[in-house]
Structures are given as C-alpha cells and as structure tokens.
Amino acid sequence: MNNLTPENIRQTILATPFLLNRIRTEFPQLAAVLNDPNAFATTWQSINASQLLQIPSSTYSMGMPSFSEDDLFDVEVQRRIEEQIRQNAVTENMQSAIENHPEVFGQVYMLFVNVEINGHKVKAFVDSGAQATILSADCAEKCGLTRLLDTRFQGVAKGVGMAKILGCVHSAPLKIGDLYLPCRFTVIEGRDVDMLLGLDMLRRYQACIDLENNVLRIHGKEIPFLGESEIPKLLANVEPSANAHGLGIEPASKASASSPNPQSGTRLGTKESVAPNNEGSSNPPSLVNPPTDPGLNSKIAQLVSMGFDPLEAAQALDAANGDLDVAASFLL
C-alpha cells in the first residue's frame, strides 16, 4: 500500500469491514480520525504502515508445542504441522491481497433498474443467475396482478433459503425504459425484493448487461443501472456467499420432506422446475403427472420444436389437460 495516498487508504479502510474492525481494535487513535482526511493523513504518517498489514507469525504458532524427532513421525503431529503451514499460507495470501489489491475487499453493489408494471414503478433486481423472473406477493398485489395468478403452478423456490411459490402470472406488460415487453412472473412469498429480472426475460429479449457503461441494453435501448443511493436498503449490504449458487425450485411435497419450514427462505433466484397441481386437490403436487394421453409425447415434441424446454412442455400440457394450444399459451 506504499503507492497509495493517505486519502486512498482512508477510503479503502472505510469501505472494508475487515480493515475497519481491525483499525478500531488495534489502532484506536487512527480510527478516531477516519472521518477527518487531514487528521488521518497526519496520524497515518506517524504510524508505521507495515504494522497495519502485518499479522504476527506467533498468531498461528501459539499453542504449538515443540516436537521431538520421534514425534515428527506421528500422524496427528504431521496433520497439525500441515494445518499450520496451510494457515500461514492463507495469512500470507491475505496480506498480499490487502497490500497489492485492497479494492477486492470493497463492497459490490447489486444491479437494479427502474421498471413499471401496470403503471406501478418498481425497482427490479437484475440477476442472470436466476432462471425465472420473480415477483413478490406484495408487489403483485400492488400492481393488480393477483387476479391473474395461476395457483396451479405452486412449489418451493430453493437457494440459500427457501420460499413458497404461490403461482404464476403467465403474461403481464412490463415497461423497461421506453420498451413495453410481455413478461411471465413467478409469484413467491417474501419481501426482500419486489421484482427479480431473471435469465428467462434477459435471454428472451437478448438483453446485454454492460458493466463497462453501467447499463442494461435491450433492443438497442440503454437502461442505466441504479446508483448506490437508489438501491433498496435491504440488499445494499448483501455479501457474496458460496451458498448462493445452485438455485432451483422443487415441488412443495418434496421440499416439505426435507425442510420443516419451506417458507423460511429469502433468496429469490429460481430454477423453473415446478409442476402445476390441481386446485383444491388433497394430493401433493408432483413433478409430472403420469401420462394418460397416448399422444402426449408427440405434443411435447411439437412444443420442444417451438423452442420450449421438454420438462416445462410436459408440465404445461398437464396443466392444460392435454390441450396443445392452451399449453403453448402457458409457455409464451
């Protein structure tokens, strides 16, 4: 960090929770002047900068006893030595990152755009990692879409947590910039995000997430991403997690067997693999009902030739009681 000015260092510390906590603990005199650029520069120059970056080697060697030659051949001792070497490597790697690439410890803000649904303004979370476009139950009600909710398409959205899928709105007008685009929404419980713009819509309209220019480009139109101050506060401080991958939807019956509370999750990314279940039926929904129509395979093949997913085609035919035209309208 020797090539950085005190002001750059101050901004990096303020934007990095790890460094900020450490400064407050180990260098309170520096933490006290973090909001005063001039006082910070003076205090910084009076402190050996290397102190801020160095983690004492004794941190990981404390509690490690000395070993005799005979002990060195012990499996448990070898394992402890290996773990100490690994921890030292991790520490060295982190010190190198802080010194050479401090920006990697900064905050990454989510991508949001302004949209309108039935004349109601909504901040949509752009997520190319989610297969389906999501609408919260509250937002669907505010936008007047609950009357179009098809409750046969129920299930559970799985991600970091789980959330109950209430159904689908097969087509509703979505305004993005100057464009009016028909959109299919999966409506779920939860209030973390009003709307999530998933890969189905992004691919359908050949959208381009242009991070260099900070815009979402659709059919030549550029929709700017919202600035940090405009992002909904609930997601402004979301940290990346390894558990945020592998998002999917399971039928409600399968999810309830693996979790006592399938409505407790909050992650909105989904993978559309839910089968519609008949309203009022006491049977739990299944992935695909057993085929009773001898021409079902040929109908699925026709829908697949139109560009639809085979599993979704089978589910739509099941919901439409085998009617090919109705099933196609579900998928549009």
From Swiss-Prot:
PROSITE patterns linked to this entry: UBA
Keywords: Aspartyl protease, Cell membrane, Cytoplasm, Hydrolase, Membrane, Protease, Protein transport, Transport
Region (Disordered) residue spans: 246-298
Active-site residues, Swiss-Prot/TrEMBL: 127
First-tier enzyme category under EC: hydrolase
Subcellular location, record wording: Cytoplasm; Cell membrane
EC number annotated for this UniProt entry: 3.4.23.-
Comp. bias regions, Polar residues: 275-286
Coiled-coil annotated residue ranges, if any: none
Site (Involved in interaction with Lys-48-linked diubiquitin (Ub2)): 318-319, 327-328
GO biological process, one term: regulation of exocytosis
Site keyed Involved in interaction with monoubiquitin and Lys-48-linked diubiquitin (Ub2): positions: 308, 320, 331-332
Compositionally biased spans, kind Low complexity: 251-264
One GO location term (cellular component): plasma membrane
Membrane topology annotation: Peripheral membrane protein
Occurrences of domain UBA (ranges): 291-332
Site (Involved in interaction with monoubiquitin): 303, 306-307, 316, 330
GO molecular function: aspartic-type endopeptidase activity; K48-linked polyubiquitin modification-dependent protein binding; polyubiquitin modification-dependent protein binding; SNARE binding; ubiquitin binding
Similarity annotation: Belongs to the DDI1 family.
Function: Recognizes and binds polyubiquitin chains. Acts as a linker between the 19S proteasome and polyubiquitinated proteins via UBA domain interactions with ubiquitin for their subsequent degradation. Aspartic protease. Appears to act as negative regulator of constitutive exocytosis. May act at the level of secretory vesicle docking and fusion as a competitive inhibitor of SNARE assembly. Required for S-phase checkpoint control.
Assembly and binders: Homodimer. Interacts (via UBA domain) with polyubiquitin (polyUb) chains (via Lys-48-linked polyUbs). Has weak binding affinity for monoubiquitin. According to another report, has no affinity for monoubiquitin.
Domain-related comment: The UBA domain specifically recognizes Lys-48-linked diubiquitin units (Ub2), which is mediated by the two binding sites within a single UBA domain.
Protein name stated in the entry: UBA domain-containing protein Mud1
Organism encoding this protein: Schizosaccharomyces pombe (strain 972 / ATCC 24843) (Fission yeast)
